[in-house]
């Protein structure tokens, strides 16, 4: 299969490498022409995945039209806040039967839309019928190292889901199917907010009890938002919900948890972000999730406190105190 991968961050590079290893003809698009030249010469992405040599047959380009044109499949791995613009540029070049796979995690700040809703606004209906959404508990470095990993692909068309499942799966990468697009997407986006909170808790030295409470109650908030958007509750118990949440809240490779750790230790958000090359989606997603919950009329106390910490400069210790002193209630809604 002839595949284009749009986005050469750590995850896009890893997926392109995996697909090339799986025997497909893959071209990886990077915005930076100088990065493309270096990848061609060294078979390494020295900016975002420097410790791994990429598959020898993987091709590279900074020409978006070239990467999108005539492909059987195009994988979208651009950051969520720029995905709309990138897809608009790529769409005129796509073949009629191209399968689109979104592997971007996030909620668009301006519209409060998950990526599937963004694509609905920029793509014709016939293209949306051939779209799928990939999400789950994945650190790019571990997949690049061929460490066993499982995740979920969601599509309205089961045949498309089966095709994507088959193309991506290999001895170390197992893909499950779902038809709950919104649930799979929201799990991958909202867990980043809870990971920031878990990192703050760890940075404050609050220990494992507090982290477990945040993960569990955070999952409840994610599920409430999802159900309000007509996602299936059980989806949040799966790989794209609980699985991704646990990984991102506990794994040392989590960028969002790392940002939270530094906040808990007293560093300023702007100082933390200025020293990061890769995107921590959770910061922007916190704003979107907070506004989305307000719009939906959903109670999300952890997300609300994260908004106050990140955007209103609330002291994290005060936020924890306010969470602990809320009115007492039953655990299950």
UniProtKB/Swiss-Prot annotation:
Sn-glycerol 3-phosphate binds at residues 105, 136, 138, 191, 244, 254-256. GO terms for cellular component: cytosol. GO terms for molecular function: glycerol-3-phosphate dehydrogenase [NAD(P)+] activity; NAD binding. Its main location: cytoplasm. GO terms for biological process: carbohydrate metabolic process; glycerol-3-phosphate biosynthetic process; glycerol-3-phosphate catabolic process; glycerophospholipid metabolic process; phospholipid biosynthetic process. It comes from the Bacteria. Its EC number is 1.1.1.94. It is found in: Cytoplasm. NADPH binds at residues 10-11, 105, 140, 255, 279, 281. The active site is at residue 191. Catalyzes the reduction of the glycolytic intermediate dihydroxyacetone phosphate (DHAP) to sn-glycerol 3-phosphate (G3P), the key precursor for phospholipid synthesis. This is Glycerol-3-phosphate dehydrogenase [NAD(P)+]. It comes from Syntrophotalea carbinolica (strain DSM 2380 / NBRC 103641 / GraBd1) (Pelobacter carbinolicus). The gene is gpsA.
């Amino acid at each position: 299969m002839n595949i284009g991968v749009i986005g050469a961050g750590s995850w896009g590079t890893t997926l392109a490498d995996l697909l090339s290893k799986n025997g497909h003809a893959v071209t990886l698009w990077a915005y930076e022409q100088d990065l493309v030249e270096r990848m061609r010469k060294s078979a390494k992405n020295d900016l975002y995945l420097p410790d791994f040599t990429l598959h020898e047959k993987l091709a590279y380009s900074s020409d978006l039209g070239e990467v999108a044109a005539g492909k059987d499949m195009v994988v979208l791995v651009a950051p969520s806040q720029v995905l709309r613009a990138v897809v608009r540029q790529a769409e005129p070049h796509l073949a009629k039967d191209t399968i689109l796979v979104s592997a971007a995690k996030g909620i668009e700040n301006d519209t409060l839309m998950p990526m599937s809703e963004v694509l609905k606004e920029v793509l014709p209906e016939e293209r949306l019928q051939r779209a799928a959404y990939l999400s789950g508990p994945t650190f790019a470095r571990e997949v690049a190292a061929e460490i066993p990993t499982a995740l979920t692909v969601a599509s309205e068309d089961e045949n498309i889901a089966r095709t994507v499942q088959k193309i991506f799966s290999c001895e170390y990468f197992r893909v499950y199917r779902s038809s709950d697009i919104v649930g799979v997407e929201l799990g991958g986006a909202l867990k980043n907010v809870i990971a920031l909170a878990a990192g703050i808790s760890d940075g404050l030295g609050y220990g494992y009890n507090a982290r477990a409470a945040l993960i569990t109650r955070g999952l409840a908030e994610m599920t409430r938002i999802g159900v309000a958007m007509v996602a299936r509750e059980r989806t949040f118990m799966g790989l794209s919900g609980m699985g991704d949440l646990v990984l991102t809240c506990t794994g040392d490779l989590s960028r969002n948890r790392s940002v939270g750790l530094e906040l808990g230790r007293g560093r300023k958000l702007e100082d933390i972000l200025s020293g990061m090359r890769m995107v921590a989606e959770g910061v922007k997603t916190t704003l979107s999730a907070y506004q989305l919950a307000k719009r939906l009329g959903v109670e999300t106390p952890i997300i609300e406190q994260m908004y106050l910490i990140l955007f209103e400069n609330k002291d994290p210790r005060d936020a924890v105190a306010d969470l602990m002193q809320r009115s007492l209630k039953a655990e299950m809604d």
